[in-house]
């Protein structure tokens, strides 16, 4: 199973923007949005979470890629193609 895991924090305007971008442009991919306080430990130990939003590409319970900050839908689509996600 593959999914995009958006890690957010309270009061983060960029997090809201990224959530909207994902929901409106990637209905064919499972999307999970979670506040940093509820992110599973296995993700927290594999990624240094210092900036938000952070988008994690997970496939078969393996982190394939991640980035922090906001990106356009076009850039995310390019990443999905490059990663063959």
Name the predicted role of every residue range.
Residues 1-27:
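Local sequence-structure signature of Cys/Sec-based thiol-disulfide redox active-site neighborhoods
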Residues 4-7, 22, 31, 55, ...:
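Hydrophobic beta-strand residues in large extracellular and virion-surface proteins
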Residues 5-9, 27-42:
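Thiol-based oxidoreductase modules, predominantly thioredoxin-like and allied folds used
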Residues 16-18, 30, 58-60:
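A structural signal for the main folded, soluble domain(s) of proteins
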Residues 18-20, 40-43:
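A generic local structural motif
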Residues 41-48, 83:
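Short amphipathic alpha-helix with an adjacent loop that forms part of the alpha/beta core around
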Residues 46-56:
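Structural micro-motif
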Residues 56-85:
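Non-catalytic, surface beta->alpha helical segment in thiol-disulfide oxidoreductase systems
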């Amino acid at each position: 199973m593959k999914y995009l895991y958006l890690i957010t924090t309270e009061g983060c305007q960029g997090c809201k923007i990224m959530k909207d971008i994902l929901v409106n442009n990637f209905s064919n991919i499972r999307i999970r949005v979670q506040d940093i306080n509820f992110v599973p430990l296995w993700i927290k130990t594999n990624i240094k979470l210092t900036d938000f939003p952070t988008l994690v590409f997970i496939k078969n319970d393996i982190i394939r890629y991640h980035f922090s900050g906001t990106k356009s839908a076009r850039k995310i689509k390019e990443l999905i193609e490059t990663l063959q996600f």
